[in-house]
Amino acid sequence: MKKLVVNKKYNNKKLDKFLKDNISTLSNNLFYKTLRKKDIKINGKRVSENVTVFENDEILVYIPDNLLENKLNLDIIYEDNNILLINKPSNIEVTGQDSLTEVVHKLYSSCEFKPMPCHRLDRNTSGLILFAKNTQALEILLNKFKHHEIEKHYLALVYGIPQKKNERLISYLFKDSSKSLVYISDVPKKGYQKIITSYSLIESFDNNTSLLDVEIETGRTHQIRAHLAHIGLPIIGDGKYGINEFNKKFKAKTQKLISYKLIFKFESDSKILEYLSKKSFELKSGKKLLF
């Protein structure tokens, strides 16, 4: 149970705003579930709606402590006044409800500008994700990603041995939102968007698997997973584009794909972020996490 008293800052604010700002691990789902069960009291009276609260209101929230434990400890790789670099675990979205961004916003709730993500990772892809900590940094970084002045590198453990040690792949991708799937074509088609994926072979193994460094110049949904599967190199552990037989063989419970390196190759004016030019950040534990 949590006991809270509304301060002047939250006078005439909604209940969810007050509670989520003051209970950092309270998600939208948990808030509304608790509300439906009438497990919230304001000044001794149970409430079932997202009511307005006022200064000095006493609020009791009847939620078991284990449900309020912080389920996601942020693994911060680097932070300064402008950027925040986090190692995202798998099985969490970057944005949306109960997402990494939501957790970041709760932890930085006292900041005037809450850190915002500058690029995306699929839900089941772990690794480096870059947040901007102010408006100017966000504008600069979004522009740098758009113009490919920041390289995004991934480690992928795939089934198969590539015919070439290095290759730049150009194909076309169609996203079927109704099925949550994408399709790849080698030739342009109506509704398909151009994708560019490059890989370099790091190492191949006796069990017919390979470790690849993968770089993407475009950032489409499921791009790496679908593109590699399209050329006969499915990512191990990928339940959507991989091969279940091999996933079971290698006892892979999660897909073997990690965002492990960001390289800043600024070619145009980067203003307050000039100090990042020619820098790189690498997740040293990336390779170990795949095996």
Model-identified regions with their sequence ranges:
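Short, well-ordered beta-strand micro-motif
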Residues: 60-62, 213, 263
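RNA pseudouridine synthases
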Residues: 1-179, 205
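Short coil/loop residues immediately preceding or within conserved phosphate-binding loops
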Residues: 71, 112, 194-197, 209-211, ...
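Short, well-ordered beta-strand segments enriched in hydrophobic/aromatic residues
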Residues: 84, 210-215
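Short, solvent-exposed loop/beta-turn-alpha elements that line the ligand-binding surface or hinge
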Residues: 184
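Non-catalytic RNA-recognition surface used by pseudouridine synthases
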Residues: 168, 177, 187-203
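Pseudouridine synthases involved in rRNA/tRNA modification
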Residues: 1-29, 33, 189-190, 202, ...
